Amino acid sequence: MKIRNLLTVLAALVIVGGIYVFAVSRPDDARGAITVWYVEGGTMSNEFVALAAGYNKSISRASLPVQCVPFADEDAMAAAFDTQAPDLVLCSHYRAFDMHARGKLTGISAALGDNAPDYPRALSSRSACIGASYFPVGAEVQVLFVNTTLTAGRDLTTLEALSAAAEEYRTETGKPFYAAADYAPLFFTEYLREGEEFDAGSAARSSKVYKHIYNLLAENAYTGALSLTSGDEVSAVRAGELGCAVVGTTALPKKLSLGVSVLPVPPLTAAGGEGELGEAWGLAVVARGSRSTGDISAFLAWLFSSNRDTRLALQTQLVPARTSSLITRDALWSALIALNTGEIVALPPADSDFAANRADFERDIRARLAFLAQ
């Protein structure tokens, strides 16, 4: 009888011990998690997932880990919102602004308190959700990618000067001097600097700014100084086939080799102001069904400290959204950091006229320039 009672006690201890072992060794997702939805293979996705894994290793068991949930594309992620919702979404400002307009985002400024990231006013003024329910990490902008050997001694400080330099180079070598990967963003940026709004619609062609830009491009296309060959403009500059090219930052090489550099897109004229078109990427706070915004704000406070957000932006070839104190010897990183001057970064919403007309404008301007080049 005593033996039977002893075995019963031992069995009970084993069960209790098993429960205890399970409680302290169970996987993190059994405790719940901060869910982050993202498009697999999208901008910043791989780098963000790696950073989130680092966060999970650094926290105590009292904090919720981050669980990254991939989707095949934007449509698949949008469809998932019909039945469920995450805590955070890694997305561009286009999606974030749309969600904000439909009341789908949750402000967590109070939960962040003094840990809220500070953004330049020129950026934070783009939307009320920035810094409250949407937290940009970086932005893609157009830059001038330059072959320093071919452009040595040539004036690239304005679009007018660049056009003139292209004609000189064409006369000297018989070769094209520059190219542009996309024209619509270039027009948008130049309009912004001239104090006008570019909607990419047909009425835009009546603007003096449009005619000024178009005439410069048209002359260069007619003489062959502007390359209209669609392809890898970055490789052409690196190989010495072009002196420079207007490209997006995500098209730049991961490392800048000797003989190339990155400059801001030049203003139309010396009297031009500041501003540029950007596409921001960051985290939108949905927090639907979340037990607390405390864990979400703890993760965001961690992300936007110790230059982690800056490094994440630079790793994905974006201009950091916030002014950075990061010191680096990497030439590309230094160039991207220098591009954040606190000037106006225009972030048009997805339902803007520019977004609606952009593709048609791009096709039209390319067709016009190609006709002149024949």
Each model region followed by its residue ranges:
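Glycine-centered hinge/linker elements that transmit conformational signals in sensory
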Residues: 199-231
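Extracytoplasmic/periplasmic substrate-recognition and gating elements
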Residues: 256-319
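A ligand-binding cleft/hinge motif common to bilobed small-molecule-binding domains
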Residues: 94-100, 238, 246-260
